[in-house]
A protein has these predicted regions:
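Nucleotidyltransferase catalytic core that binds NTPs
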Residues: 1-154
Length: 154
């Protein structure tokens, strides 16, 4: 499994992977909801990729949260789930991106034809992008978006 930390080098480091299905999220503990997002990406028949962060976004946004699993554990679990590449920049490096720039990285850097995220996924500067915005933008560009509902354990 490839681990890519430099967002400027994504396209070069994914050479040979072809078109991708990208699972988006902080993936703080890799629970069954996260697995559903990765599974939705993998079931598309494209190269499964996860886009997450080396550090928890909540740490930068005043939440003070930590990951429930270590980076090594997350990478091992992603590999077990069949993810072929993990894009894992520092959150600070992408926090200022406009939602449109984030979409362009997915489309052109990752060659994403399918994207999967949770219903509560937010992205872009000031969390300007959400699942509804992403759905419209993907549809306009011929990509498929899978929004995974929140999973509750009873």
């Amino acid at each position: 499994m490839r681990v890519i930390r430099d967002t400027e080098a994504i396209k070069e480091q994914l050479l040979g992977c072809g078109k991708t299905a990208v699972a988006l999220g902080a993936f703080d503990g890799l629970h069954i909801g996260h697995r559903a997002v990765v599974r939705a990406a993998a079931e598309s028949g494209l190269t499964p990729v996860a886009f997450t962060f080396r550090d928890n976004p909540a740490e930068h946004l005043g939440g003070g949260c930590r990951y429930l699993t270590t980076m090594e554990e997350r990478l091992r679990i992603f590999a077990e789930w069949g993810v072929e590449a993990v894009i894992m920049p520092d959150f600070a490096d992408v926090a200022g991106w406009a939602a449109e720039r984030f979409l362009n990285v997915l489309r052109f850097g990752l060659s994403a034809q399918a994207v999967a995220c949770g219903a509560d996924f937010r992205f872009g500067k000031f969390a300007a992008g959400d699942a509804a915005w992403l759905a419209r933008s993907c549809a306009q560009r011929g990509a498929v978006l899978h929004v995974v509902d929140t999973v509750c354990y009873k």
